[in-house]
Amino acid sequence: MTKDMTTGPITPLLVNFTIPLVLGNLFQLTYNAVDSIIVGKFVGEDALAAVGTSNPLMTLAILFINGVCLGAGILVSLAFGAGNTELVERQVSTTAIAGSVFSLVFSLTCVILANPLLRLLQVPEEILPIAVNYLRIVFGGLLFTFFYNFLAATMRALGDSKSALYFLMISSVLNIGGDLFFVKVLDWGSEGCALSTVLSEALCCVFCLIYIRWKVPVLQLGRRWFIFDSSLLKKTISYGWTSAMQQATVQLGKIAIQAIVNTMGVNAMAAFAAAGRIDDFAYVPQQNIGHATTTLMAQNRGAGKKERVRASFFCGLKLEFLYAIFITAVCFFFAEPIIRLFVTDAAVVHLGVRFLKLVSLFYLMPSLTNGIQGGFRGLGDLKITLNSSTLNMAGRVAAAALFVLLMKMDIEALPYSYVVGWILMLVYEAPMMVKYLRKGEL
């Protein structure tokens, strides 16, 4: 069901739209943990290591595609907010056609480059064949990844975040069921796990299309799914490419940080992995609030309602601030019991607690950066979000390399490197947002 977000109280609209986004991502994080448990338990340590070492590349490809869909979704929100159903149809069909061609080319490229990319990451020879096979199967299904993310992004752009949540839950349940069947019953190893991922996304695409046919009249395009509007393509590429590059930049930064952590020893790696799981639960809702703010602003911008655009932005910032206070308190005061959920070794727990307590003190900073980025996306200025994310990751990686590799600091150096990145991000973003406010463009 679509939701017109250009009327009604803004705070309830934003909260109700954000909650399914948060639940969906938390569900995805939980699934990722279960997926690793199944591989580790029923296949073995080599397979788990192969899947684990493949995940950064797999995540990079998926986030790139997700970025394309996010950028295209903003254009759909603008058209829907303006009440231009015909433009919504042309935007959706054009993105679907162009995205399909791109996904097939991207998929083939990734399949070919899987081996050299894994070698670049210095994957041990004994698990390299397992990792290559796993990655090639996942990369082979990137067309389904695109359509699943595109349909979900389109429904969110139309104000329907609940349906996207339901389909994410269905996909995750299918994936877990497929993992158990292919891995435990058929004994297909990590390849079975990869096949389960591809098939679950393919089935979810079918379910999405059935639902759209049944419940979303504006997307019941029929033959119009094959309409390609070249006049829309340039803007779609601009939004999609910029958003995709931002997502890719963030993931590349994470890979670089992990490489630096790997030089600190096994205990630090384990502590960082445990604390990193908690970090995900801290950051993801902040990102979701930013994405919800984007949709609300874009619909109202399309409708020409400047006051609601401005009010939506500041409402998003307030929610970001409130969540930051909550998650800071939880992670600081309950750091040790939370870390012990993941590890039991005393030395690892000690390192993990130190990291989590320190980084939690700065959670207000990413809440501000995510809120501001949501605002820029809602205004259609994605270049600023790309530039600020690049500054963030460059500063973070450079600071981590300085603190850890040159100054030989321990795990407590990493939160400070995060702060360097966030400060650079805010120093760049804040003046830009002030300019928008002073010019009356927000």
Predicted feature descriptions by range:
Residues 39-59, 125-130, 190-193, 232-239, ...:
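Interfacial/gating helices of multi-pass transporter permease domains
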Residues 69, 137-156, 164-172, 193-208, ...:
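Short runs within selected transmembrane alpha-helices of multi-pass transporters and secretion channels
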